[in-house]
């Protein structure tokens, strides 16, 4: 058998594993969604679902292991397997797979992106930032390799916003400049993917970190976000965040009028807190 045929067979098998992986994750997501109330309230139900998920993923994991044993230099398979391992909360295993992929293919932007985001997630969960510099380096390189991938731009901006102080030390600029740098990266992501609500919402939220708070610019950003909202929940989130921006800008009456535009129940707890805080401000005696 020729090397070309061997490679073609490997790609076909890898595609089948990816399909099985995606199908399993889709099914598990459905299980969680359909049983959310029960697993939140009942520990036995939660444990039973966890066992069901483990059993569903076990054969997929074995397929990856068998494939990588026969094709250890297949970088894309290692990237995919690393992502798979995040679903079973095997953090170090995922990191090891992405680093192994980068040894084989140092220009694999997907591996660099995944590594950076995972290191950032671990830092947020553990409140330890020792891996953040590696995350910055990885996303810097991913963007260099593929500057037109909006996901990398968005992820980099989010990483900067989440770790302003470490980023300021790493890039040797002030935290305020880090936020401005992040907004620039969000701008790049939005230019590449202008209808992505998440990108626009995260950009608008970043203005909260600027001092003095640019109220007008923040409101304009949320208006642009609202214009591309496609679901009632997205619209409610944009209204809630617009109200928060008005609150920070001390535009109390605009807070109340904006909150009245919300129609769903999902964010009403936060809206209620903001409404009460605004009423307290309005009741304060004027100097």
Please describe what each predicted stretch is:
Residues 1-65, 70:
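N-terminal leader/linker segments that initiate helical-solenoid repeat arrays
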Residues 17, 22-25, 29-32, 36-39, ...:
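Short coil/turn linking the two alpha-helices of tandem helical-hairpin repeats
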Residues 54-62, 87-100, 122-141, 165-188, ...:
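Structural signature of tandem alpha-helical TPR/SEL1-like repeats
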Residues 62, 233-287:
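Terminal, low-structured helical/coil segments at or just beyond the last alpha-helical repeat
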Residues 67, 100-101, 141-142, 188-189, ...:
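Canonical positions in the second alpha-helix
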Residues 72, 106, 147, 194, ...:
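Short coil turns that delineate tetratricopeptide repeat
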Residues 77, 111, 152, 199, ...:
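TPR alpha-solenoid repeat register
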């Amino acid at each position: 058998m020729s090397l070309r045929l061997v490679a073609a067979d490997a790609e076909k098998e890898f595609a089948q594993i990816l399909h099985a992986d995606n199908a399993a994750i889709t099914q598990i997501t459905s299980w969680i969604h359909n049983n959310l109330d029960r697993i939140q309230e009942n520990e036995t139900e939660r444990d039973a679902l966890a066992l069901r998920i483990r059993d569903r993923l076990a054969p997929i994991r074995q397929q990856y292991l068998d494939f990588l044993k026969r094709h250890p230099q297949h970088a894309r398979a290692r990237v995919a397997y690393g992502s798979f391992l995040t679903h079973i909360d095997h953090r170090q295993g995922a990191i090891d797979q992405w680093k192994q992929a980068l040894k084989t293919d140092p220009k694999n932007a997907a591996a660099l992106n995944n590594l950076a985001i995972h290191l950032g997630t671990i830092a947020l969960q553990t409140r330890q930032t020792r891996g953040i510099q590696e995350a910055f380096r990885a996303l810097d390189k991913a963007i260099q390799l593929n500057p037109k991938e909006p996901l990398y731009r968005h992820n980099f901006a989010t990483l900067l916003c989440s770790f302003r102080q470490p980023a300021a030390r790493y890039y040797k600029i002030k935290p305020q400049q880090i936020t401005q740098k992040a907004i620039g990266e969000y701008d790049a992501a939005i230019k590449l993917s202008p209808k992505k609500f998440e990108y626009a919402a995260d950009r608008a939220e970043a203005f909260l970190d600027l001092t003095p708070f640019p109220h007008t610019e923040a409101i304009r950003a949320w208006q642009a976000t609202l214009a591309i909202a496609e679901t009632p929940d997205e619209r409610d989130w944009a209204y809630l965040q617009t109200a928060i921006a008005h609150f920070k800008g001390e535009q109390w009456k605009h807070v109340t009028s904006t909150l009245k535009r919300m129609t769903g129940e999902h964010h009403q707890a936060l809206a209620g807190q903001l409404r009460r805080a605004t009423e307290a401000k309005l009741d304060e005696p004027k100097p």
